[in-house]
């Protein structure tokens, strides 16, 4: 994809908000080149506009929340993931509530709607962020890293003390095709005891078997089961793609994560952008030359403090 892209026409949908339980109406409209992704609260007096960028992240508890001038929109990661995964650079997202509709808990409904209205090429070249040197962040056992690569690669590993999850790892090179085929249908998941606790606190009020995979101590409660045997780690990748879009441009680099989440993903973006010597920008035509070679730079085991990820890197 050499040039920037946006929607061919408007799309609209309605679903509940995962945490509020309220019905949410959302419309996504085309945007001009270099406009980026803009969120708009249509239920506020002045139709508050919020640019999707790291500086506007206000919370990463349970979901990623973007806010500006007193207005905020939460649970943005799935729609941002769909737009990024399908190569959409510019769009205006309008919602009449402080939360993005959860749909079925994955990005598949958004991808299907994008395909239905179509995606068009714009007149300006894309700009890519090219990772030049490894950057990493950690918190406890959790770890996230961006390293040089000649494409956007993702390697992710999770561990849960549950008989149906245990350890899962996945690696892919991201493209429209791999995102649609392998990632976008993976649903958010949670544990019944946690859902009950959150709902007692007035959170996750919209959560149900229609929009999440719910597990008790031994099994999956959803009658239809999983969409893929590794749906859990794939959903974490889906979330990460949305969180990494806070960079504001497509990435040429290798994202490596072990038990990461919204907070750590946001911390990684911040750490990367704060160190200008570790990245540069380039057009698609020359991004492979931005760090002086056409293949991914090698990095040694000592660069990776979370050694448990190594098994996933070579999967």
UniProtKB/Swiss-Prot annotation:
InterPro entries noted in UniProt: Ribosomal_Su5_D2-typ_SF, UDP-acyl_GlcNac_deAcase, UDP-acyl_GlcNac_deAcase_C, UDP-acyl_N-AcGlcN_deAcase_N
Biological process per Gene Ontology, one example term: lipid A biosynthetic process
Pfam family, one: LpxC
UniProt entry keywords in alphabetical sequence: Hydrolase, Lipid A biosynthesis, Lipid biosynthesis, Lipid metabolism, Metal-binding, Zinc
Sequence positions that bind Zn(2+): 78, 235, 239
Pathway: Glycolipid biosynthesis; lipid IV(A) biosynthesis; lipid IV(A) from (3R)-3-hydroxytetradecanoyl-[acyl-carrier-protein] and UDP-N-acetyl-alpha-D-glucosamine: step 2/6
Top-level taxon of the source organism: Bacteria
UniProt-listed Enzyme Commission number(s): 3.5.1.108
Record's keyword annotation contains Zinc: yes
The protein's role, per its UniProt record: Catalyzes the hydrolysis of UDP-3-O-myristoyl-N-acetylglucosamine to form UDP-3-O-myristoylglucosamine and acetate, the committed step in lipid A biosynthesis.
Family designation: Belongs to the LpxC family.
Name this polypeptide is given: UDP-3-O-acyl-N-acetylglucosamine deacetylase
Provenance organism: Syntrophus aciditrophicus (strain SB)
Gene responsible for this protein: lpxC
């Amino acid at each position: 994809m050499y040039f920037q892209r946006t929607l061919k026409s408007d799309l609209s949908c309605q679903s509940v908000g995962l945490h509020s339980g309220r019905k949410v109406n959302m419309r996504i409209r085309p945007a001009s080149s270099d406009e980026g992704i803009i969120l708009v609260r249509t239920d506020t007096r002045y139709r508050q506009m919020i640019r999707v960028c790291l500086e506007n992240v206000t919370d990463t508890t349970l979901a990623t929340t973007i806010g500006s001038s007193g207005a905020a929109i939460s649970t943005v990661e799935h729609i941002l993931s769909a737009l990024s995964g399908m190569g959409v650079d510019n769009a205006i997202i309008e919602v009449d509530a402080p939360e993005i509709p959860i749909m079925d808990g994955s990005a598949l409904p958004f991808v299907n709607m994008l395909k239905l209205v179509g995606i068009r090429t714009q007149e300006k070249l894309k700009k890519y962020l090219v990772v030049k040197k490894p950057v990493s962040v950690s918190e406890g056992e959790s770890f996230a890293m961006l390293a040089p690569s000649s494409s956007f690669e993702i390697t992710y590993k999770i561990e849960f003390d549950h008989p149906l999850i245990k350890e899962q790892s996945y690696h892919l090179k991201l493209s429209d095709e791999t995102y649609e085929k392998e990632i976008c249908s993976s649903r958010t998941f949670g544990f019944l005891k946690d859902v009950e606790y959150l709902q007692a606190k007035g959170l996750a009020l919209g959560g149900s078997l229609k929009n999440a995979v719910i597990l008790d101590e031994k099994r999956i409660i959803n009658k239809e089961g999983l969409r893929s045997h590794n749906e859990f780690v794939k959903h974490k990748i889906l979330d990460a793609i949305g969180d990494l879009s806070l960079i504001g441009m497509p990435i040429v680099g290798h994202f490596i994560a072990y038990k990461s989440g919204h907070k750590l993903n946001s911390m990684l973006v911040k750490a990367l952008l704060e160190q200008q010597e570790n990245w540069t920008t380039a057009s698609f035509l020359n991004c492979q030359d931005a760090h002086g070679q056409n293949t991914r730079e090698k990095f040694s085991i000592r660069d990776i403090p979370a050694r448990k990820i190594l098994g996933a890197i070579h999967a």
